[in-house]
């Protein structure tokens, strides 16, 4: 009596292994891709938070002017811009903050709105 596997059994086992290995590699590749996106969004959020903090230190008149600049963080150059918004309420001021890796803002990674009171603090 012969012991061992037939050629068909070996080929079937290799095909199953190849399919499962491909699936594992695709999952790992997707996880690495997601990690890069999450890292970009996190750092862009930090840049936006820094700009929000600076806006809180400005006067109401300074916040009412559109501003644009760049910041270096986590080994990359980030571009940010602030856009004042009309709220229809004299006691409330809103400013949109956008952050991008591109100077032309073709792809905005982080966008948020900051609200400021017109009473108290710096005017």
Curated annotation (Swiss-Prot):
Compartment annotation: Cell inner membrane
Phylogenetic placement of the source organism: Bacteria, Pseudomonadati, Pseudomonadota, Gammaproteobacteria, Enterobacterales
Function field: Component of the type II secretion system required for the energy-dependent secretion of extracellular factors such as proteases and toxins from the periplasm. Part of the pseudopilus tip complex that is critical for the recognition and binding of secretion substrates.
SUPFAM superfamilies: Pili subunits (SSF54523)
Keywords: Cell inner membrane, Cell membrane, Membrane, Methylation, Transmembrane, Transmembrane helix
Name this protein carries in UniProt: Type II secretion system protein I
Family matches, as Pfam families: N_methyl, T2SSI
Any single biological process term in GO: protein secretion by the type II secretion system
Modified residues (N-methylphenylalanine): 5
Modifications the protein undergoes after translation, according to the UniProt entry: Cleaved by prepilin peptidase.
Naturally occurring in which organism (per UniProt): Escherichia coli
Membrane topology: Single-pass membrane protein
Record family assignment: Belongs to the GSP I family.
Cellular component terms (Gene Ontology): plasma membrane; type II protein secretion system complex
């Amino acid at each position: 009596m012969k012991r061992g596997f037939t050629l068909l059994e070996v080929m079937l086992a290799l095909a199953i292994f190849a399919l499962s290995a491909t699936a594992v590699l695709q999952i790992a590749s997707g996880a690495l891709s997601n990690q890069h996106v999450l890292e970009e969004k996190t750092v862009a959020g930090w840049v936006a938070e820094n700009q929000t903090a600076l806006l809180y230190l400005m006067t109401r008149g300074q916040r009412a002017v559109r501003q644009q600049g760049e910041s270096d963080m986590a080994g990359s150059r980030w571009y940010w811009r602030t856009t004042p918004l009309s709220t229809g309420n004299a006691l409330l001021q809103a400013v949109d903050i956008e952050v991008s890796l591109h100077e032309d803002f073709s792809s905005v990674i982080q966008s948020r709105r900051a609200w400021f009171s017109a009473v108290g603090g710096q005017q």
